[in-house]
Amino acid sequence: MSSPLEKPQIIAHVQKPVTYTLFDCKWIPCSAKFVCVGNLARGSGVLQVYEIQQGEAKLLQEAEKPKPIKCGTFGASSLQQRYLATGDFGGNLNIWNLEAPDTPVYSAKGHNEIINCIDGVGGVGIGEGAPEIVTGSRDGTVKVWDPRQKDTPVANMEPAAGETKRDCWTVAFGHAYNEQERLVCAGYDNGDIKLFDLRNMSVRWETNIKNGVCSLEFDRKDIVMNKLVATSLEGKFHVFDMRTQHPSKGFASMSEKAHKSTIWQVRHLPQNRDVFMTSGGAGNLHLWKYEYPAQRSRKDSDDVDMGVAGSVSLLQNVTLSTQPISSMDWSPDKKGLCVCTSFDQTVRVLIVTKLNKL
């Protein structure tokens, strides 16, 4: 990639101003539509569905909800139904049919406080086993839900009695490569990262990255754990090689100081797991490529396998706004198409070029 013209370019295709605070956006699988959720000025929540038509974003659906909606996922829904699961400021977990979004098809009082983050697995053709949703909240708990089971979570990871409750900011499923195996990774405001094994209900690994963990994502949910990216408050992100776990040192990792402000989100390209985008608090997006080391593991002095971290290279960066880009989502179907939202009350559809050349 010698000349600038050979590098991927990040092009703003559509910019759509809205009249509310945007918190999350998701592409609707197998469509040219996306959904946005957020907070109206009068304190209620809003859910909107847009479709890309002739270079414009056309509003198809809008529904107002009692509580502001913080996060959403299609990860536990079938490709036929494409139901959106959301978490709101009241601690409620709801699942919506976007064709008729007036009343939820599933509802549970999930948490005592705001649901900050949500993820799903077992739906949209990703991950083996039953569909499940995970939610993380300010109340310090991480809960796993089966949308076929009402009211009670199938797993509840909460601090032990006497432990301080930390604000859970981000959750991610991974390792769902067969019907038995499944992991949840959770990140907290004090820099803790915890990896929960749902098969034997234990903490498989934990670490601390010294700054609040804003976003976590495995490069793929439906394979044996490969890589995990964690982003943090001080403009730094960490990439953990999850293939080799050392008994005392854990997983090998590398870190990169990229943005000069909080890195709000990381999203891996669905069509290439070694390419990912980070979104920053100064309104910028950075596109990265992970390079594996020559050998991913080596023996330590006691002849025990330990991982070797790789490196990242910056492919492209662009500043879209003066406000934080709070969420972004790649299209699962069209390589290089993505949608992002910012606190400048604008949703943007972007096209990233030349990704097939990487």
Curated annotation (Swiss-Prot):
Its main location: other. Pfam families: WD40 (PF00400). It is found in: Dynein axonemal particle. InterPro entries: WD40/YVTN_repeat-like_dom_sf, WD40_repeat_dom_sf, WD40_rpt. The keyword Hydrolase does not apply. Keywords: Apoptosis, Cytoplasm, Repeat, WD repeat. It comes from the Eukaryota. SUPFAM superfamilies: WD40 repeat-like. One of its GO terms (biological process) is apoptotic process. GO terms for cellular component: dynein axonemal particle. Coiled coil: none annotated. WD repeats lie at residues 64-106, 116-155, 163-206, 208-250, 258-298, 320-358. Interacts with PIH1D1; the interaction associates DNAAF10 with the R2TP complex. Interacts with several dynein axonemal assembly factors. Key assembly factor specifically required for the stability of axonemal dynein heavy chains in cytoplasm. This is Dynein axonemal assembly factor 10. The gene is dnaaf10.
